[in-house]
Amino acid sequence: MKLTLSWLKDHLDTDEPLEKLADKLTMIGLEVEGIEDKAKVLAPFTIAKVLTAAKHPNADKLQVCTVDVGDGAAPVQVVCGAPNARAGLVTVFAPPGTYIPAKDFTLGIGNIRGVESRGMLCSAAELQISEDHDGIIELPADAPVGAAYAAWAGLGDPVLDINLTPNRQDCAGVHGIARDLAAADMGKFKDPGIKPIKGEFPCPVSVTVEDSTLCPGFALRLVKGVKNGPSPEWLQKRLTAIGLRPINALVDITNYLTFDRSRPLHVFDAAKVKGNLVVRRAKDGETLLALDGRTYTLDSSVCVIADDHGVESLAGIMGGELSGCSAETTDVLIESALWNEINIAQSGRKLGINTDARYRFERGVDPAFMLPGLELATKLVMEFCGGTPSDVVVVGNPFADDKIIDFPLAEVKRLAGIEVSLTEIRRILNHLGFTVVGQAPVVKVAVPSWRSDVHGKADIVEEIVRIVGVDKVPLTPFERGDAPRKPVLTQIQNRTRRAKRALAARGLTEAVTWSFISKPFAEAFGGGQPELALANPIASDLSDMRPSLLPGLIAAAQANADRGSPDLALFEVGQVFKGDRPQDQFMAASGVRRGVASSAGLGRHWSGSAQATALDAKADAFAVLAAAGAPMAGLQIATNKLPAWLHPGRSGAIQIGPQNVLGYFGELHPRVLEQLGADGPLVAFEVILEKIPDPKQRPTRAKPALELSAFHPVSRDFAFIVDRKVAVADIVRAAQGVDKKLITSVSVFDVYEGKGIDPDKKSVAIAVTLQPRDKTMTDQEIEAVAAKIVAEVTKKTGGSLRG
């Protein structure tokens, strides 16, 4: 939001210096991002007169001018290429050493085609005061030669640039900013009433609103017999100062009121409107040639203003070229309306149009100012262009319901920690437009129509505190009682942190990918349901919520491979989505390894290089589970009911019991890699952290006592012949279950298939460690345990001890 100091003073009677006003604006929540003072930037530029202009001896399009720069100085020679440079012309001169804003360089003494030039005659574009660059500036003949140009031209009006927060739509106009400053004791607020202008005849154009939810209020007035020409110089200067281009009086009035009162309006050339106006939804396929020169194709989600001919305006966003006002306009229709904020935002985003009107309507304008805004526009049209006004046509209810809030005065102390008297509270709120009725301890506060952002007691406290001064709020540390502190992190947050550390420790690099993926990718990983499709995706290939982290990691791995880094290991811990309910959202830990990126390390090595395998992915998954507190002894590997994205013969599921699947690991299916446009092979894993069962005992900071046995451990090896389909894990669990206190370790050290073994059999060798606690074991006791192990494995697997 830009405004000039003189513009602000039209609404605020103040003598405060600019710097103090800017500081106060920032302190009350209207952050001043910058101040542009053209008088300082253009200080070196002076008014000069061209005495002679002769053709350059070595260039057809250049002239050698002698210039009177005033102050009794000798004439200066300047080489100029402007077509309008001529003797007797009064213009703007820049001496050597002057910084030229538009060209971003400092002028020096030049030599142009063999002729010395000791300065520059300037165009308006070079001074960045307009877009005119066709010739040098032409000033009146009586302009004082030698005087500072900026001071003479009235450019000493600083421009403030305010960064508005989305909730302060009332300050999208200079009037609202002045109101806030007046409440902060920076001056007296000027708020003259707006008198209705009596119509001289009935308006011949009627208005129909088909959907009042899109347009709660609409007002229209015809002004006949106008003479549309340039707007007054003061208005043109204000619009130019804030970056707008003056067009003609009718259009400039609407732009002025947009920034002055945050009241966007639109003007139609009445001669170009056919029949009556209808506010409706656009028909699919309808088009509009808009004022920006572009043709837009519309659909039924866009609200438009149409006549008998078709669409004439994008409601609340931009008017149409065919009904726009020009110098030939003699009858003008002035429109002032209220529009649905959400529809304006969605339509503007869909069409890719950003306008000052859209900016204000999508944040909400003052509904009570719809009719006064029309009256003020009518007054300015008649003042600048003449004409005779009609009666006003009003459709809908432009008035918002009164909002009354019961406000306990103690809320200021409770929420902000400062004491503010009722007298001061009344003063502040009254200056801001609120009405306060009643006495302590609870008063009733009526919210003004332009403050749609104020909904409750906390909002009123905010208004009081920002005017009193946020710097008045004391620094109050939180009280810390004697009770022990509760954990800051939830269990899932702890698991997330530990999983990240475990994977980083294994050499994987963390990646952060989009939560959105394309529909085909989502379907390949079990997603793609209609409820997971985005209503308004930011890109066509980011249309669905991800059911897995792996599509993003696979794409990242392939992108690195395409750029010369084929060997890498990536992981991510983030949300995945199985449905649209909160309970369908899970925290997953996933990773991929590609190329020579096994657990042993990345890239080639003197000792040999090995491609990453499913066992590397399994080790990564187990590292996550161990870090997250899973009961590792109870984990099982299953090879049935695997997801379609895994290779059926080189993958597995990690589960506890037959139902609770914690995750998957293995090599990705070649068909899925082809669908994702990735080169294989790739190995991957995914663990759902919420599926890990809670520990039976509450975690404690106290470490368990270290128990070391004084007796030697005993190790025994066993080899069993079992069917090939028997899982090795079944043998390990059977052996461990014989005596969980005595047996401290069971590990597999050999699996053999081949000569001497039946084709449908295999030999599995395990090492069992016994750790006595009370005494040294005798041979008989060892043999008894060994016999139990053989019997239990035989019973559970159907195998036999290998001879």
Swiss-Prot record:
Domain FDX-ACB: 709-802
InterPro entries: aa-tRNA-synth_II/BPL/LPL, B3/B4_tRNA-bd, DNA-bd_dom_put_sf, Fdx_antiC-bd, Fdx_antiC-bd_sf, NA-bd_OB-fold, Phe-tRNA-ligase_IIc_bsu, Phe-tRNA-ligase_IIc_bsu_bact
Organism: Rhodopseudomonas palustris (strain ATCC BAA-98 / CGA009)
Main localization category: cytoplasm
Enzymatic class: ligase
Compartments (UniProt record): Cytoplasm
Protein name, as recorded: Phenylalanine--tRNA ligase beta subunit
UniProt keyword Ion transport, yes or no: no
GO molecular function list: ATP binding; magnesium ion binding; phenylalanine-tRNA ligase activity; tRNA binding
Pfam families membership: B3_4 (PF03483), B5 (PF03484), FDX-ACB (PF03147), tRNA_bind (PF01588), tRNA_synthFbeta (PF17759)
